[in-house]
Amino acid sequence: MATVQPIVNSHLSELDEDVFHHFGFTTKSFDFKEKFGDVKFVCVCGSSGRIHNFAISMAKLAGLALPVENIAGSHARFVLYKVDHILFADHGMGIPSALIMLHEVTKLLHYAGCKDVLFIRLGTSGGLGVKPGTIVLSDRCVNTKLEPYNELCILGKPVRRQTIVDLNTVNELKKLSENLSLECSVVVGGTIAANDFYEEQGRLDGSICTFSKEEKLAFLQSAYEHGIRNMEMEGTAITSHCYLTGHRAILVCVTAVNRLEGDQITISTDEFTLFAQRPGQLVGEYLKRNNGIIVR
Protein backbone atom coordinates (compact mmCIF):
# COMPACT_ATOMS: atom_id res chain seq x y z
CA MET A 1 0.00 0.00 0.00
CA ALA A 2 0.98 3.63 -0.40
CA THR A 3 1.16 4.28 3.33
CA VAL A 4 0.75 2.08 6.41
CA GLN A 5 -1.83 4.27 8.13
CA PRO A 6 -3.68 6.59 5.73
CA ILE A 7 -5.12 9.80 7.06
CA VAL A 8 -8.91 9.84 7.41
CA ASN A 9 -10.69 13.09 8.27
CA SER A 10 -12.63 12.31 11.46
CA HIS A 11 -14.94 15.28 10.84
CA LEU A 12 -16.51 13.47 7.88
CA SER A 13 -18.36 11.12 10.22
CA GLU A 14 -20.22 14.12 11.64
CA LEU A 15 -21.80 14.97 8.28
CA ASP A 16 -25.33 13.80 7.56
CA GLU A 17 -24.73 14.54 3.89
CA ASP A 18 -21.41 15.35 2.24
CA VAL A 19 -21.65 17.74 -0.71
CA PHE A 20 -19.18 17.14 -3.53
CA HIS A 21 -19.57 20.68 -4.79
CA HIS A 22 -17.11 20.48 -7.69
CA PHE A 23 -18.58 17.21 -8.99
CA GLY A 24 -22.21 18.20 -8.54
CA PHE A 25 -23.49 15.37 -6.33
CA THR A 26 -23.73 14.38 -2.66
CA THR A 27 -23.43 11.22 -0.61
CA LYS A 28 -27.21 10.90 -0.93
CA SER A 29 -27.17 11.01 -4.75
CA PHE A 30 -26.43 7.28 -4.99
CA ASP A 31 -24.98 4.34 -3.07
CA PHE A 32 -21.22 4.99 -3.20
CA LYS A 33 -20.24 1.41 -2.33
CA GLU A 34 -22.50 -0.02 -5.01
CA LYS A 35 -21.48 2.50 -7.68
CA PHE A 36 -17.76 2.90 -6.95
CA GLY A 37 -16.80 0.01 -4.66
CA ASP A 38 -14.92 -1.89 -7.38
CA VAL A 39 -12.63 1.00 -8.44
CA LYS A 40 -8.95 0.02 -8.71
CA PHE A 41 -7.62 2.87 -10.84
CA VAL A 42 -8.22 6.61 -11.19
CA CYS A 43 -6.98 8.27 -14.38
CA VAL A 44 -6.74 12.06 -14.39
CA CYS A 45 -5.58 14.80 -16.70
CA GLY A 46 -5.95 18.54 -16.96
CA SER A 47 -8.36 18.68 -19.88
CA SER A 48 -11.96 17.51 -19.59
CA GLY A 49 -12.01 16.80 -23.32
CA ARG A 50 -8.85 14.71 -23.20
CA ILE A 51 -9.99 12.59 -20.25
CA HIS A 52 -13.36 12.09 -21.95
CA ASN A 53 -11.63 10.82 -25.07
CA PHE A 54 -9.50 8.47 -22.99
CA ALA A 55 -12.58 7.12 -21.20
CA ILE A 56 -14.21 6.53 -24.59
CA SER A 57 -11.15 4.66 -25.86
CA MET A 58 -11.15 2.39 -22.80
CA ALA A 59 -14.90 1.78 -23.12
CA LYS A 60 -14.40 0.74 -26.75
CA LEU A 61 -11.56 -1.55 -25.73
CA ALA A 62 -13.85 -3.13 -23.13
CA GLY A 63 -16.60 -3.60 -25.70
CA LEU A 64 -19.04 -1.31 -23.90
CA ALA A 65 -21.75 0.69 -25.60
CA LEU A 66 -21.24 4.43 -26.02
CA PRO A 67 -21.63 7.17 -24.91
CA VAL A 68 -19.82 7.03 -21.59
CA GLU A 69 -21.96 8.64 -18.88
CA ASN A 70 -20.67 11.76 -17.13
CA ILE A 71 -21.49 11.01 -13.49
CA ALA A 72 -20.82 14.61 -12.45
CA GLY A 73 -23.73 17.03 -12.21
CA SER A 74 -24.69 19.34 -15.06
CA HIS A 75 -23.19 22.40 -13.35
CA ALA A 76 -20.08 20.67 -12.00
CA ARG A 77 -16.58 22.06 -12.34
CA PHE A 78 -15.09 18.65 -13.10
CA VAL A 79 -16.20 15.64 -15.14
CA LEU A 80 -16.30 12.06 -13.87
CA TYR A 81 -16.60 8.83 -15.87
CA LYS A 82 -16.41 5.17 -14.91
CA VAL A 83 -15.49 2.25 -17.12
CA ASP A 84 -15.40 -1.08 -15.28
CA HIS A 85 -12.78 -0.67 -12.52
CA ILE A 86 -11.49 2.73 -13.67
CA LEU A 87 -12.57 6.25 -12.74
CA PHE A 88 -11.71 9.13 -15.07
CA ALA A 89 -11.63 12.79 -13.97
CA ASP A 90 -10.12 16.08 -15.05
CA HIS A 91 -8.16 18.21 -12.59
CA GLY A 92 -7.85 21.52 -14.37
CA MET A 93 -4.59 23.45 -14.41
CA GLY A 94 -2.23 23.82 -11.47
CA ILE A 95 -1.82 22.49 -7.94
CA PRO A 96 -4.80 24.35 -6.37
CA SER A 97 -7.26 22.96 -8.92
CA ALA A 98 -5.72 19.48 -8.73
CA LEU A 99 -6.02 19.44 -4.94
CA ILE A 100 -9.75 20.22 -5.11
CA MET A 101 -10.24 17.22 -7.39
CA LEU A 102 -8.04 15.05 -5.18
CA HIS A 103 -9.91 15.89 -1.97
CA GLU A 104 -13.25 15.01 -3.51
CA VAL A 105 -12.15 11.88 -5.39
CA THR A 106 -10.28 10.45 -2.39
CA LYS A 107 -13.35 11.15 -0.22
CA LEU A 108 -15.45 9.32 -2.82
CA LEU A 109 -13.10 6.33 -2.57
CA HIS A 110 -13.29 6.48 1.23
CA TYR A 111 -17.09 6.35 1.21
CA ALA A 112 -16.97 3.55 -1.37
CA GLY A 113 -14.58 1.49 0.75
CA CYS A 114 -11.83 1.47 -1.90
CA LYS A 115 -8.24 1.06 -0.69
CA ASP A 116 -4.81 1.24 -2.33
CA VAL A 117 -6.15 2.67 -5.59
CA LEU A 118 -3.61 3.63 -8.26
CA PHE A 119 -3.91 7.22 -9.50
CA ILE A 120 -2.43 7.84 -12.94
CA ARG A 121 -1.89 11.36 -14.24
CA LEU A 122 -1.75 11.48 -18.03
CA GLY A 123 -0.51 14.89 -19.05
CA THR A 124 1.53 17.21 -21.18
CA SER A 125 4.72 18.86 -19.99
CA GLY A 126 7.85 20.74 -20.91
CA GLY A 127 10.82 18.45 -21.45
CA LEU A 128 14.39 18.88 -20.26
CA GLY A 129 16.94 17.45 -22.65
CA VAL A 130 14.39 15.26 -24.42
CA LYS A 131 12.74 15.99 -27.74
CA PRO A 132 9.05 16.91 -28.06
CA GLY A 133 6.80 13.86 -28.12
CA THR A 134 8.79 11.90 -25.54
CA ILE A 135 6.90 10.14 -22.73
CA VAL A 136 8.41 10.77 -19.29
CA LEU A 137 7.66 8.27 -16.53
CA SER A 138 8.37 10.12 -13.29
CA ASP A 139 10.60 8.33 -10.79
CA ARG A 140 10.17 11.24 -8.37
CA CYS A 141 8.36 14.57 -8.23
CA VAL A 142 9.89 17.71 -6.73
CA ASN A 143 9.04 21.38 -6.32
CA THR A 144 11.05 24.15 -8.00
CA LYS A 145 13.59 23.98 -5.16
CA LEU A 146 14.16 20.37 -6.25
CA GLU A 147 12.72 19.16 -2.95
CA PRO A 148 10.33 16.15 -2.82
CA TYR A 149 7.55 18.06 -1.12
CA ASN A 150 4.30 19.81 -1.86
CA GLU A 151 4.20 23.02 0.16
CA LEU A 152 0.95 24.42 1.56
CA CYS A 153 -0.02 27.13 4.04
CA ILE A 154 -2.73 25.77 6.38
CA LEU A 155 -4.27 28.06 9.01
CA GLY A 156 -1.42 30.47 8.36
CA LYS A 157 1.28 27.86 8.98
CA PRO A 158 3.61 26.30 6.39
CA VAL A 159 3.11 22.58 5.78
CA ARG A 160 5.36 20.33 3.70
CA ARG A 161 3.97 17.03 2.46
CA GLN A 162 6.26 14.38 1.03
CA THR A 163 5.80 13.24 -2.55
CA ILE A 164 5.86 9.50 -3.21
CA VAL A 165 5.78 7.87 -6.65
CA ASP A 166 4.87 4.19 -7.05
CA LEU A 167 8.16 3.00 -8.54
CA ASN A 168 6.95 -0.58 -9.02
CA THR A 169 4.33 0.61 -11.49
CA VAL A 170 6.82 2.99 -13.14
CA ASN A 171 9.14 0.04 -13.77
CA GLU A 172 6.25 -2.06 -15.09
CA LEU A 173 5.29 0.68 -17.53
CA LYS A 174 8.87 1.10 -18.71
CA LYS A 175 9.18 -2.63 -19.40
CA LEU A 176 5.79 -2.64 -21.11
CA SER A 177 6.80 0.27 -23.35
CA GLU A 178 9.78 -1.72 -24.59
CA ASN A 179 7.43 -4.43 -25.86
CA LEU A 180 5.00 -2.09 -27.61
CA SER A 181 5.33 -0.42 -31.00
CA LEU A 182 5.12 3.14 -29.71
CA GLU A 183 6.08 5.95 -32.06
CA CYS A 184 8.13 7.73 -29.40
CA SER A 185 10.83 7.34 -26.79
CA VAL A 186 9.90 6.53 -23.20
CA VAL A 187 12.30 7.72 -20.51
CA VAL A 188 12.32 7.51 -16.72
CA GLY A 189 13.32 10.66 -14.84
CA GLY A 190 12.43 13.29 -12.30
CA THR A 191 9.59 15.78 -12.66
CA ILE A 192 9.33 19.34 -11.38
CA ALA A 193 5.85 20.58 -10.44
CA ALA A 194 5.80 24.38 -10.52
CA ASN A 195 3.18 26.82 -9.24
CA ASP A 196 3.23 28.71 -12.53
CA PHE A 197 3.73 28.19 -16.25
CA TYR A 198 6.01 31.18 -16.73
CA GLU A 199 8.27 32.50 -13.96
CA GLU A 200 8.55 29.39 -11.75
CA GLN A 201 9.43 27.34 -14.82
CA GLY A 202 12.08 29.85 -15.83
CA ARG A 203 10.41 31.13 -18.97
CA LEU A 204 11.56 34.39 -20.51
CA ASP A 205 8.31 35.06 -22.40
CA GLY A 206 5.85 35.95 -19.62
CA SER A 207 4.59 39.49 -18.99
CA ILE A 208 7.05 39.68 -16.06
CA CYS A 209 10.61 38.32 -16.06
CA THR A 210 13.19 39.28 -13.42
CA PHE A 211 16.05 37.01 -14.49
CA SER A 212 18.46 36.75 -17.41
CA LYS A 213 18.67 34.10 -20.09
CA GLU A 214 21.90 32.91 -18.50
CA GLU A 215 20.24 32.52 -15.10
CA LYS A 216 17.39 30.61 -16.68
CA LEU A 217 19.69 28.20 -18.48
CA ALA A 218 21.78 27.67 -15.34
CA PHE A 219 18.62 26.69 -13.42
CA LEU A 220 17.40 24.33 -16.13
CA GLN A 221 20.82 22.77 -16.63
CA SER A 222 21.16 22.19 -12.89
CA ALA A 223 17.75 20.51 -12.85
CA TYR A 224 18.77 18.33 -15.79
CA GLU A 225 21.98 17.30 -14.02
CA HIS A 226 19.86 16.31 -11.01
CA GLY A 227 17.95 13.89 -13.25
CA ILE A 228 14.92 16.08 -14.01
CA ARG A 229 13.45 15.35 -17.43
CA ASN A 230 10.22 17.38 -17.46
CA MET A 231 8.25 20.16 -15.79
CA GLU A 232 4.52 20.47 -15.16
CA MET A 233 2.16 21.96 -12.56
CA GLU A 234 0.27 19.27 -10.65
CA GLY A 235 2.56 16.37 -9.79
CA THR A 236 3.54 17.27 -6.23
CA ALA A 237 -0.13 17.65 -5.27
CA ILE A 238 -1.06 14.27 -6.72
CA THR A 239 1.90 12.28 -5.37
CA SER A 240 1.67 13.76 -1.86
CA HIS A 241 -2.12 13.68 -1.43
CA CYS A 242 -2.45 10.12 -2.67
CA TYR A 243 0.29 8.95 -0.31
CA LEU A 244 -1.39 10.55 2.71
CA THR A 245 -4.78 9.07 1.87
CA GLY A 246 -3.49 5.53 1.37
CA HIS A 247 -3.32 5.39 -2.41
CA ARG A 248 -0.54 5.13 -4.98
CA ALA A 249 0.28 7.58 -7.76
CA ILE A 250 2.31 7.79 -10.95
CA LEU A 251 2.83 10.53 -13.53
CA VAL A 252 2.90 9.74 -17.26
CA CYS A 253 3.46 12.93 -19.25
CA VAL A 254 4.43 13.64 -22.83
CA THR A 255 6.72 16.56 -23.63
CA ALA A 256 5.66 19.39 -25.94
CA VAL A 257 8.95 21.34 -25.99
CA ASN A 258 12.59 20.89 -25.00
CA ARG A 259 13.09 23.70 -22.49
CA LEU A 260 16.86 23.64 -22.95
CA GLU A 261 16.22 24.87 -26.50
CA GLY A 262 13.32 27.30 -26.02
CA ASP A 263 10.30 28.40 -24.02
CA GLN A 264 7.43 28.53 -26.48
CA ILE A 265 5.52 25.53 -27.74
CA THR A 266 5.99 25.73 -31.50
CA ILE A 267 4.75 22.32 -32.60
CA SER A 268 1.58 22.40 -34.68
CA THR A 269 -1.87 21.86 -33.21
CA ASP A 270 -2.07 18.51 -34.98
CA GLU A 271 1.28 17.46 -33.53
CA PHE A 272 0.24 18.54 -30.04
CA THR A 273 -2.99 16.54 -30.32
CA LEU A 274 -1.05 13.50 -31.53
CA PHE A 275 1.56 13.79 -28.78
CA ALA A 276 -1.12 14.23 -26.08
CA GLN A 277 -2.58 10.83 -27.01
CA ARG A 278 0.68 8.98 -26.39
CA PRO A 279 0.43 8.59 -22.59
CA GLY A 280 -3.01 7.04 -23.08
CA GLN A 281 -1.66 4.50 -25.54
CA LEU A 282 0.81 3.20 -22.98
CA VAL A 283 -1.45 3.51 -19.94
CA GLY A 284 -4.40 1.98 -21.80
CA GLU A 285 -2.41 -1.16 -22.53
CA TYR A 286 -1.28 -1.31 -18.92
CA LEU A 287 -4.86 -1.02 -17.65
CA LYS A 288 -6.01 -3.74 -20.03
CA ARG A 289 -3.29 -6.10 -18.82
CA ASN A 290 -3.93 -5.33 -15.15
CA ASN A 291 -7.69 -5.92 -15.09
CA GLY A 292 -8.73 -2.30 -15.21
CA ILE A 293 -11.32 -3.25 -17.80
CA ILE A 294 -13.30 -6.38 -18.58
CA VAL A 295 -12.93 -7.17 -22.29
CA ARG A 296 -16.29 -8.45 -23.51
Swiss-Prot record:
Any GO BP annotation: uridine catabolic process
SUPFAM superfamilies on file: Purine and uridine phosphorylases
Catalytic activity: uridine + phosphate = alpha-D-ribose 1-phosphate + uracil
Binding annotation for uridine: 125-126, 201-203
Keywords of this entry: Glycosyltransferase, Transferase
Domain of life: Eukaryota
Protein's name in the database: Uridine phosphorylase A
Species of the source: Schistosoma mansoni (Blood fluke)
